[in-house]
Amino acid sequence: MKLLGWNSKDIGVDLGTANIIVTIKGKGIVLNEPSVVAIDKNNGDIIATGSEAKEMLGRTPDEILAIRPLKDGVIADFTATQLMLKSMIQKICQRYNAGRPRVVVGVPSGITEVEERAVEESVMQAGAKEVY
């Protein structure tokens, strides 16, 4: 079985401490955004991700939490990382009509097996057909 075949939508995600970079086969880099998420504390909804959320760091009302969920190469906030990743992948899939893509995710080297599984589940919940 080929990991990245010629007849499917394949996405690569670099889940970095500073930025998340997303590529689509044949299109190159389609997203390079800060690894930041803003979450409504009352209901857990995503308010913003990436550059928009970065602008909110230290400037949000009490009911909104803007954070960098990855710190020093590890996942510092497990839930926020899941929400951020899911939101960004859903946006890319919609914007580029990626349907249910196969996704390869590069994760920080220091994450635990539980965190790795959570990243995989987040990508699947975002609509991926397969995650590697």
Residue map of PLM features:
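Nucleotide/phosphate-binding catalytic cleft detector across ATP-hydrolyzing
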Residues: M1-Y132
